[in-house]
């Protein structure tokens, strides 16, 4: 390494070891029954509103929502929720395409997973057409010939745009081309683009020349003619003669995989596009001499009832003008529009597009004069609307052109055509409501576009929180139909109550209790069931994890002796759990009539919230009991207890009592585990050991694969573990005695002999004295002599 003259400062890693990061102590795991939720998936929630989002709100007969709300209201900050159900199926619906046949499958779900149960039967989905791009087509001509074009110097064409008085003179010169005798469509288009701002041109995928107007309307028109003034005619070489020289003849079928558009905004390669025309009738004759008034025509639109269009002398200031005629028709038009073509003749158009769009003119009934001839419609042949769907192939933003994959089945008159993308909007609603729970706009059924409906709504992070989608036509080639507009209800959602086996679950499939295997929790509760089998499994699960603790309660209706009998089988020498009784009374959030304003619930969630609150304020080594351990939301208890009752429950049954304390409220009044070994008697001791184990386990991962020598052992002992334990001691976790009397660290050659080192073992031993709670307060009150004397005066 080269150094500069002067002071050079280098940063190196040094010999410091990572410090111990305190492990979390109060993330609660809840196994619950709930209104909804993806079964057997541990979902992280940080508020009750989060819980409602994923699992629904309160439901009669279930305690999960009450427990979770109690947890957060009592100081909890983070929980993992697992929904348990018996046999369950999601609600479903099939959305058909307009032409029939299934287009989209819908299931009740959450972020791409099935969310089964009866809750989904209250959902419906509404589909609305929602094209993300719709564009009109300007007048355009596709030349018949294919490049190269045999042009000569000083050749050209004249292009009349929208019946302008003077045509645009397009002239070709040798300098415009690499080889004018073998001119390309792109080279010719570049010359045309420079000729006038009213024209634009491009090359088709088949190497034809396309010329387009820059405006799109019924009056948009292009006509190509031979040039004058001694300029060589290039129209024949380009293929711009006869029908191919007039935009009114439409885009010819042979070359109809491209169109100039008014705007390509919103079109994407791979998207589905619908190319539509609308029913129209164009007057072949100019407006003639006015008839005797009243006069009129009957216009039939899309096969409906005839619309009577009538003209009176009062519609005109004098001799009828085209503007007055248009205004009179527009005042009466229903379902159709009227405009003028480039030559000034009239055109009537249906306001609908595609198949079924029709318009026809007939003489009026009765004494009204027939205005057909006056308006120029004598001999007019109506043209029905058409439509064809295809896949967008390319987008030319600069040239404003769109190409698609296959040729049209019929010629396309740009004046009455549009191209729109095929997208839809899907709204999810609750039954009986018109306000959507969520709405997804711009969805497509094309699999290779970003807005493919199943991809968007099934996204695991940003997808729908109510439904999942499936494509019954996945893998089918070409354009797939969108679901037809309309509202469809979901149905068939069902569920049964979970069995003990469902609550316990399987380690192989990570269901039930084992759904928590992949996440960190330090507390565990199952407020829905007090089944002995489930409680035993939960206690065993926590013990096997070694970092968590179960909190349970006896069933409602048990008296003190019944509670002790219930808890007896769960007691053992070393148990990772605690029991609390009796049930607590809270306000009933489901009561809207005042008939049942309060209800009893198991205290599990509220107790875990107190655990979290007191650990955050005082440290995990502080017993979560006493006057500070108030259960917020609790209005009462199932039965009262005297001091003697509490002592009996705690000493004999190892069950912690919840009772009303005057001046304090409803409090947790003891902190025993179910352990019979006095070393593991208290909740705070169990929690402190779990905390120390987890913290050291997390922070000593750096030791793996390090060279095992005395230097490593010293780093671990003095640089990592010692500062951590000193920090806990200074906060009171080990009492007030000197540090060397309350904890010991052993990490040296005595517990890492060469034989173990050779086998890859690294042994660290930590011993500490956990502070115990003052559980029985003994106050002695007695009299003493005052020492005063009396005397007679």
Write out the residue ranges for each language-model feature.
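Long, low-complexity, polar/charged, intrinsically disordered or flexibly structured peripheral segments
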Residues: 470-504
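Peri-functional-center coupling elements
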Residues: 177-179, 183, 462-464, 474
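Structured, hydrophobic secondary-structure cores that serve as assembly/anchoring elements
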Residues: 1-92, 429-434, 477, 484, ...
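Polar helix-capping/helix-linker motif
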Residues: 446-452, 462, 531, 709
């Amino acid at each position: 390494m080269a150094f500069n003259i002067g002071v050079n400062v280098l940063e190196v890693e040094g010999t410091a070891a990572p410090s111990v990061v305190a492990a979390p102590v109060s993330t609660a795991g809840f196994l619950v029954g709930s209104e909804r939720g993806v079964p057997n998936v541990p979902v992280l929630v940080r508020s009750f509103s989060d819980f409602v989002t994923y699992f629904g709100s309160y439901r009669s007969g279930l305690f999960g929502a009450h427990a979770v709300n109690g947890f957060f209201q009592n100081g909890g900050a983070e929980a993992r929720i697992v929904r348990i159900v018996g046999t369950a199926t999601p609600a479903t619906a099939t959305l058909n395409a307009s032409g029939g046949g299934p287009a989209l499958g819908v299931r009740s779900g959450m972020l791409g997973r099935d969310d089964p149960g009866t809750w989904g039967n209250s959902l419906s989905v509404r589909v609305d057409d929602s094209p993300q791009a719709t564009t009109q087509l300007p007048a355009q001509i596709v030349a018949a010939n294919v490049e190269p074009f045999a042009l000569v110097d000083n050749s050209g064409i004249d292009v009349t745009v929208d019946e302008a008085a003077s045509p645009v003179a397009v002239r070709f010169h040798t300098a415009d081309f690499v080889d004018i005798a073998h001119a390309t469509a792109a080279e010719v288009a570049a010359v045309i683009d420079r000729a006038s701002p009213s024209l634009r041109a491009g090359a088709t995928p088949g190497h034809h020349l396309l010329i387009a107007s820059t405006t799109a309307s019924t009056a948009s028109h292009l006509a190509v003619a031979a040039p004058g003034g001694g300029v060589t005619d290039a129209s024949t070489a380009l293929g711009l003669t006869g029908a191919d020289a007039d935009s009114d003849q439409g885009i010819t079928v042979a070359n109809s995989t491209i169109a100039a558009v008014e705007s390509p905004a919103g079109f994407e390669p791979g998207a589905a596009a619908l190319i539509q025309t609308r029913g129209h009738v164009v007057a072949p004759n100019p407006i003639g001499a006015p008839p005797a008034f009243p006069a009129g025509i009957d216009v039939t639109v899309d096969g409906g009832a005839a619309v009577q269009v009538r003209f009176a002398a009062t519609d005109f200031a004098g001799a009828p003008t085209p503007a007055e005629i248009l205004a009179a028709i527009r005042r009466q038009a229903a379902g159709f529009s009227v405009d003028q073509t480039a030559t000034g003749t009239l055109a009537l158009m249906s306001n609908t597009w595609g198949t079924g769009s029709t318009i026809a003119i007939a003489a009026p009934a009765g004494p009204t004069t027939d205005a057909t001839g006056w308006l120029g419609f004598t001999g007019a042949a109506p043209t029905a609307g058409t439509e064809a769907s295809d896949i967008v192939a390319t987008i030319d933003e600069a040239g404003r052109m769109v190409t698609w994959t296959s040729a049209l089945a019929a010629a396309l008159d740009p004046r009455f055509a549009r191209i729109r993308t095929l997208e839809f909007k899907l709204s999810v609603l609750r039954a009986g409501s018109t306000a959507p729970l969520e709405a997804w706009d711009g969805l497509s059924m094309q699999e290779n576009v970003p807005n493919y409906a199943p991809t968007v709504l099934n996204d695991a992070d940003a997808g729908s929180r109510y439904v999942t989608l499936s494509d019954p036509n996945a893998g089918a080639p070409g354009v797939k139909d969108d679901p037809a507009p309309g509202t469809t209800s979901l149905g068939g959602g069902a569920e049964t109550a979970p069995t003990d086996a469902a609550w316990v679950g399987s380690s192989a499939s990570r269901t039930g209790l084992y759904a928590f295997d992949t996440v960190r929790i330090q507390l565990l509760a199952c407020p829905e069931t007090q089944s002995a089998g489930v409680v035993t499994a939960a206690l065993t699960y926590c013990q096997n994890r070694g970092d968590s603790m179960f909190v349970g309660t006896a069933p409602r209706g048990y008296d003190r002796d019944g509670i002790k009998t219930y808890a007896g089988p769960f007691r053992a020498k070393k148990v990772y759990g605690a029991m609390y009784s009796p049930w607590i009374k809270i306000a009933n959030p489901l009561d809207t009539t005042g008939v049942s304003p309060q209800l009893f619930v198991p205290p599990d969630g509220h107790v875990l919230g107190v655990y979290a609150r007191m650990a955050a304020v005082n440290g995990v080594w502080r017993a979560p009991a006493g006057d500070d351990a108030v259960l917020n939301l609790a209005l009462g208890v199932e039965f009262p207890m005297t001091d003697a009752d509490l002592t009996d429950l705690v000493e004999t049954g190892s069950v912690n009592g919840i009772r009303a304390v005057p001046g304090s409220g409803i409090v947790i009044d003891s902190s025993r585990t179910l352990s019979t070994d006095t070393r593991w008697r208290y909740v705070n001791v169990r929690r402190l050991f779990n905390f120390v184990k987890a913290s050291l386990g997390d922070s000593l991962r750096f030791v793996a694969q390090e060279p095992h020598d005395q230097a490593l052992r010293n780093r671990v002992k003095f640089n990592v573990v010692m500062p951590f334990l000193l920090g806990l001691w200074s906060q009171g976790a080990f009492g007030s005695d000197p540090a060397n009397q309350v904890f010991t660290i052993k990490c040296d050659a005595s517990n890492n002999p060469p034989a173990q080192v050779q086998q890859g073992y690294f042994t660290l031993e930590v011993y500490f004295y956990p502070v115990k709670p003052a559980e029985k307060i003994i106050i002695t009150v007695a009299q003493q002599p005052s020492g005063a004397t009396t005397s007679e005066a």
